[in-house]
Amino acid sequence: MKRTNYAGLIDETYLNQTVTLTGWVQKRRDFGDLIFVDLRDREGIVQLTFNATNADALAVAEKVRSEYVLKITGHVIERAENQINTKIKSGTIEVDVTEAEILSTSKTPPFYIEDDVNANEELKLQYRYLDLRRPEMQKNLRIRSKIMSSAMHFMDTHDFINIETPVLAKSTPEGARDYLVPSRVFPGSFYALPQSPQLFKQLLMGAGFDRYFQIARAFRDEDLRGDRQPEFTQMDVETSFMTADEIRELVNAWVKAMMHDVVDFDLDTAEIPTLTWQESMDRFGTDKPDLRIAYEIKDLSETVKNSEFGVFANAIKGGGVVKALAVPGGADHYSRKDIDKLTKYIERFGAKGLAWMKVAPEGLTGPIAKFFDDEAQAALIASADAQVGDLLLFGAGRADVVSATLDYLRRETAKALDLIDQTNPWAFAWIVDWPLFEYSEDFDRWIAAHHPFTMPNEEDLHYLNDGEDPHKAHAQSYDLVLNGYELGSGSIRIHRMDIQEKMLKALGFTPEKAHEAFGFLLEGMEYGFPPMGGIALGLDRLAMLLAGQENIREVIAFPKNSRATEPMTEAPTRVEGKQLNELGLFVPEAE
């Protein structure tokens, strides 16, 4: 059954040669004694011709239908002038078939195997093996493969050691909900699928491996969205005896190599900006800004603190802020009805309304313009860095609500007005100097902004002492952002037990609880751990961006849907009572 070539790679260089090809039937066009078949494989499509000169092959062609698997042998010839297709690599040639064999038949597929197919998402996931035949999906998964190959090559040439860490691990209270795996041998006890290899890679540094790398699977039982899945893949790195700056330089070189290998883009890492977390929040309202959007959020709190507009004045008096976004050209684009839609949407961020004005040649117009005299209007326009024709959108109130609201409005308006700079397709940025802690509304307490093993800035270590306010501390942590997505997160780790114990105490752990959860790590630190740091880059998210997709499902072979189920295999499913009994588990019958 040996084939000589991939069908999609046949071009003019193969003219007058005999080839043997295999693949799937994309289309069949029957003209009696002349039949055309488009044969598809992973590389693309080539046109086959069957005619009465080769009667046996023609008889086979009369039987084939879409998605039949075919093997043919034939001669590569030039297409007739009216048959040339400039959209495909093989568009100037075709294969005159002399031998043909049907290797497999196919039922009529539930949707067309072609890009831009108009099919229900659940249906495509149910028949994922058919969806994966589409050229776009083939391209996406090959981009993913290239990223992994490039990463492994880079790490190998930079003396990193590829080490696997356990998938059945201990449940530790360090982040999202764990996926638990019951133990048959120890009834009532559970393993947890790892949310990251974090603790194991720190222990590997303690073991002296110095440079660790792994393409690791990780699992988090959390609510899903377009750029998250319950199981995901990260390119995980840990190093000893390197500073945060040195680690970022290493990652810059790594990302530069990947961009060249995968999308043939020459990334100038010297132009990757570094922003503090606070600067990013002030300018963009988010810790993962899309720097392809030129306009930024402006703080107008000082400008409007004595305003006659009660919403602004009361926000300032209540300890809040007033900020604005000047949307270029937005005045003509957005009607009152359009703005009402934006107002309704931002309620999910806690915003109670959306104040707005338009910048006209004669000054500001809109429902709240009457509260500002000419001098106040001029001050507003200047403070917001606005121009005639701009739409001014305001956020007033609690700082976090204002940030979330204006971040969304910045991204949404840029998309609607086509204001995303396409000349800068890959806008990377480093976000540094993060708060060590953040307040969680879900848990109603302070939690680690990254994880409990992040080293505070040297000058902030005293905040972990008794009597100090630990929430003032900042961390030696850093995130790599690309086009408004968090691509990777890393930090310098705590390598001293005294600091780690203080950190856990600040998070509410008693000494007993700390040793119950992390005793193995704390004990390891008593045996001489080196200074260490690392990062993990999300493979799924990077592949999504490099493939030009908007959902990571498009770059994962067999993903879950938004309900964390897998329509093709119908996972998760209930299991037999015998299996539950062996595990010492009781599950009530479903109603």
UniProtKB/Swiss-Prot annotation:
It catalyses: tRNA(Asp) + L-aspartate + ATP = L-aspartyl-tRNA(Asp) + AMP + diphosphate. PROSITE patterns: AA_TRNA_LIGASE_II (PS50862). Pfam families: GAD, tRNA-synt_2, tRNA_anti-codon. L-aspartate binds at residues 174, 220, 450, 493. It is found in: Cytoplasm. It is an enzyme of class 6 (ligase). Belongs to the class-II aminoacyl-tRNA synthetase family. Type 1 subfamily. NCBIfam families: aspS_bact, PRK00476.1. This is Aspartate--tRNA ligase.
